[in-house]
């Protein structure tokens, strides 16, 4: 289950030894009044971890976004499409399409529910994309955002290359595109190799 891998409180090796954490640089983009800050612990000193065995693997910026039903029950709701994603997608589409007023209206309506002190004023598209990155953290969308926008992957200062293979990857770089299997390119002459 997703919660057996991603929650902070279910007792599984994937959680105790493979702790999930937000990029510290992304965390720092949130204002002090952003309610989503509670989804992570920047100190890594959880006093309320369900078992003492969890404490050995506790790290700064550890996930608190996903909570399983219990230490021995990995059940949890998995949202395949969230309303917040629709708000952020609409705001981005209007902003990129030149309708800044509509984009700001939609984004502000969404953002004040996360950050009551939100007042805007920055680059609107950047604000939308930052909020999208925070809101949809670990929900499987970041890779596709980077690919569609042609942006580089930068993991940040709190990642260990031992566990993630690389810390940075340039857009379009080899190993950053899903390769079409060789058997497909060998047998389908209309399919071009991308490896």
Language-model regions: role of each:
Residues 1-20, 30-195:
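Acidic/polar-rich alpha-helix caps and helix-coil junctions
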